[in-house]
Curated annotation (Swiss-Prot):
Subunit organization: Part of the 30S ribosomal subunit. Forms a bridge to the 50S subunit in the 70S ribosome, contacting the 23S rRNA.
Function of the protein: One of the primary rRNA binding proteins, it binds directly to 16S rRNA where it helps nucleate assembly of the platform of the 30S subunit by binding and bridging several RNA helices of the 16S rRNA.
Family: Belongs to the universal ribosomal protein uS15 family.
PANTHER family, A to Z: RIBOSOMAL PROTEIN S15, BACTERIAL AND ORGANELLAR (PTHR23321), SMALL RIBOSOMAL SUBUNIT PROTEIN US15M (PTHR23321:SF26)
Organism (species): Acidovorax ebreus (strain TPSY)
The gene coding this protein: rpsO
Gene3D superfamilies tied to this protein: 6.10.250.3130, S15/NS1, RNA-binding
UniProt cross-references to InterPro entries, sorted A to Z: Ribosomal_uS15, Ribosomal_uS15_bac-type, uS15_NS1_RNA-bd_sf
A GO CC term attached to the entry: cytosolic small ribosomal subunit
Classification via SMART domains: Ribosomal_S15
NCBIfam families, per the entry: S15_bact
GO BP, one annotated term: translation
Protein name per its UniProtKB record: Small ribosomal subunit protein uS15
This protein's UniProt keywords: Ribonucleoprotein, Ribosomal protein, RNA-binding, rRNA-binding
GO MF annotation, one: rRNA binding
Length: 88
């Protein structure tokens, strides 16, 4: 679980407006932060299959949000993946 201070920073860095907490950009950035925090755990605990299921669910949800954003506004999509360092 990411700390609330880190979560607030991620929201602030990716928000489209001052009160934006639910745009696809913010949701993808928060999921990316959670995924990046969990990745070292699975390098150390390779047999944690129940936890890996949750990780794969987060990755799938992020992919769906990115696909939605790409369909709606390709410029915002390319800017976001460049900012977060994700592959296409």
């Amino acid at each position: 679980m990411i700390a609330s201070s880190v979560k607030a920073e991620v929201v602030k860095a990716n928000a489209r407006s001052a009160n934006d907490t639910g745009s696809p950009e913010v949701q993808v950035a928060l999921l990316t932060a959670r995924i990046n925090e969990l990745t070292p755990h699975f390098k150390q605990h390779a047999k944690d299959h129940h936890g890996r299921r949750g990780l794969l669910r987060m990755v799938s949800r992020r992919r769906k949000l990115l696909d939605y954003l790409k369909a709606k506004d390709a410029d915002r999509y390319t800017a976001l993946i460049a900012k977060l360092g994700l592959r296409k």
